[in-house]
Amino acid sequence: MINFDEFMKVDLRIAKVIDAENVEQADKLIKITVDLGKEQRIIFAGIKDIYEPDSLIGRNIVVVANLEPRKMRFGVSEGMLLAAGDDENGVFLVTPDTGASPGMRVR
């Protein structure tokens, strides 16, 4: 278990997907460009078998904004999106209510 102070170190932010494309040589990856309000980031997400890239564009999602960048075979991933799911029911992106805008901190 982590304590409350450790949990508070995780910076969850609202991000708007402004571009998404399949990573051609990867079975599961989509390259997603997000707007975090004051900056844009690239995130590689293993959701290719669940979402079409075009269906992601314009959506607000929740991302981990202070995750250390991770060098991958196809580029550097600068965050992680949040999703819920299991093998039986599939995977679903965590999305905010209407009114939330890019850069807002999830509390």
Regions found by a protein language model. Name each.
Residues 1-107:
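Phosphate-backbone binding interfaces of nucleic-acid-interacting proteins
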